[in-house]
Amino acid sequence: MPNWIQSVQSYFHAFLHLFYPHICLQCGTDLLAQHQVLCSNCEAQLPYTHFGNMQNNPVEKMFWGRVPVQFASANLFFTKESIVQKLIIELKYHQNKKAGMLLGRLIAIEIKANPKFQPIDYLIPIPIRKNKLRKRGFNQSLIICESIIANGIDACLFTGLKKSKNTLTQTHKDRLQRSSHSNTLFNLTDFKELKNKHLLIVDDVITTGATIEAACLSLSIAQPGSVKVVTAAYTLR
């Protein structure tokens, strides 16, 4: 199928979803439950990375020689015009929390199936800038964390990691700029409870790893027992 036809179909289904929210975001079929965002057929077609089963997977390699991360993984591949991109757009720009709940549920399934994630004491969502929070009304990573816990992962939620100021997004900087900027990207508050605890940092999409690297540097002040990372998606470049 030509790319332009796929693009037209994608925009058409997104348009329908604005007015008929109980249809599948991908194929447009009726959904059986109001909490769904994808039908069972489209959910079954999600592109899993299976990074959790790989030694030295691409996400782990992002942090080699930079920050101590015991284990890192991403659940799905993120590419343009994909189901995963639609889910992220729905969550971040259309305020569709059901998309975040789905992404969190899928991560919870992966955590239960993979002992490399254990133990987990705290889930730590990557915070967003204050202006984005005001505009969006919520932090998408927090929605994913809440869904992970709601789907059976016994961990506490820590929200003491804060964005320090409204800086340019990390993706607009080169690696050297990101590294020099990382120490001022986050503030950490009320962190005494994290000492010797096992932390799982959670975000929606990982591209370069720079933002999570900065979070790890800030969290190191708390002297945690271990730090692990999971994201809903990994940008395939």
Please name every model-derived segment:
Residues 1-202, 207-237:
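Glycine-rich phosphate/pyrophosphate-handling loop used in enzymes and phosphotransfer proteins
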